[in-house]
Amino acid sequence: MSLLYEGKAKRIFSTGTSDVLRVEYKDEVTAGNGAKKDFIEGKGRLNNQITSRIFNYLKAKGLNSHFIEQISETEQLVNSVEIIPLEVVVRNIAAGSITKRLGFEKGHTFETPLVEFFYKNDDLNDPLITEDHIKLLQIANDGEIEKLKEAATEINEVLVNLMDKMNLRLVDFKIEFGRTNEGEILLADEISPDTCRIWDKQSDTNFDKDVYREDTGSIIETYQTFLNKLEAL
């Protein structure tokens, strides 16, 4: 098995099967598009276990992803997909960049979930783009854009209900999708506190990577508490 790709949080390896890949979660955490970076032992284990549980939960609700199975504390097998270079962001509550970009007060609840697209390009700092931009860049066509929006909205509905059972609020999250060789679009990458903004219902305490971004707590303790809540369901 050979290393195919190494990103900020994961390594991707080939397997003996052409359409199956092995993903290894790293003990690294970054913020600000890599401007802040640290090695934190145990983080890979937590992200792998959380993502595996959430992908299995989504599958049970009829929402498929590239995920096949967890094979170790830090590894999982996934179906090979060509990643679509978009971050699909769903916002239920105003926080983060949208408060600066559009002036919403932090904590403002949107009447309906807001779906945004960001172009995955480190050199351009992952800019917000429109549906017309997506077509102009030949990233996806009209039908695929609608599928991405519909899938993101369905995933959001399931995750909001899941977090509610954990006494948490899903503020926002970002997800990625990929195409199979047959052209099917599947949820890919990960869903974890690295990719979500999650608040405690009573205290608004963060259960996500903001504790690292803002130096307000231990990322390991925060993620472990989140996993404990997930396992308790």
UniProtKB/Swiss-Prot annotation:
Annotated SUPFAM superfamilies: SAICAR synthase-like (SSF56104)
Family annotation (PROSITE patterns): SAICAR_SYNTHETASE_1 (PS01057), SAICAR_SYNTHETASE_2 (PS01058)
CDD domains in UniProt: SAICAR_synt_PurC
Enzyme class: ligase
EC number: 6.3.2.6
GO MF annotations, alphabetized: ATP binding; phosphoribosylaminoimidazolesuccinocarboxamide synthase activity
Catalyses which reaction(s): 5-amino-1-(5-phospho-D-ribosyl)imidazole-4-carboxylate + L-aspartate + ATP = (2S)-2-[5-amino-1-(5-phospho-beta-D-ribosyl)imidazole-4-carboxamido]succinate + ADP + phosphate + 2 H(+)
TM annotation in the entry: none
Pathway: Purine metabolism; IMP biosynthesis via de novo pathway; 5-amino-1-(5-phospho-D-ribosyl)imidazole-4-carboxamide from 5-amino-1-(5-phospho-D-ribosyl)imidazole-4-carboxylate: step 1/2
Listed GO biological process terms: 'de novo' IMP biosynthetic process; cobalamin biosynthetic process
Pfam (any one): SAICAR_synt
InterPro entries for the chain: SAICAR_synt/ADE2_N (IPR028923), SAICAR_synt_PurC (IPR033934), SAICAR_synth (IPR001636), SAICAR_synthetase (IPR050089), SAICAR_synthetase_CS (IPR018236)
UniProt cross-references to HAMAP family, sorted A to Z: SAICAR_synth (MF_00137)
Family per similarity comment: Belongs to the SAICAR synthetase family.
Name recorded for this polypeptide: Phosphoribosylaminoimidazole-succinocarboxamide synthase
Annotated gene: purC
